[in-house]
Amino acid sequence: SAIVMDHRTDILDLRTALEVLRQTPGQLVETDVEVDPEAELSGVYRYVGAGGTVMRPTRVDGPAMVFNNIKGHPDTSVAIGVLASRQRVANLFGVKKEELGHLLCECAKAPVQPIVTDKPAPCQEVVHRATDPDFDLFKLVPAPTNTPVDAGPYITLGMCYATHPDTGLSD
């Protein structure tokens, strides 16, 4: 059976989402053991979070993971699997998983306007500019290489939620 978290409407950022997962049994595994972003990080998640080589989507009850010690990237963490199951996403948004597609549609129709503030913002604690002389995205972001045969490191989120036009069934 799926883990159901308390109804959430106060999750407005990744930090809060991770904290909610930390407080929900079985939803987050965190490690300080060094992991190499080249094939090792995704391999560890494959067995701990996804439950081995499985049909997609990822195992519904598998935890998200936070790696706090990334080889070559001191003081950097990587979160993986936060949105790995529809049930987890639904729990974080406080809706039933069958309502996610409709929620996405509603959000696209009524986007939230940005808020401008003169106060310190947590998302601006560290700022890197492409115009900085030492700017190098590959040194800043520990983008994983998922397999030894990948063309290189990449950041991606493949997500699709569709409803069959004739049957009304959603995937």
What residue spans do the PLM features occupy?
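Extended, highly charged
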Residues: I3-D171
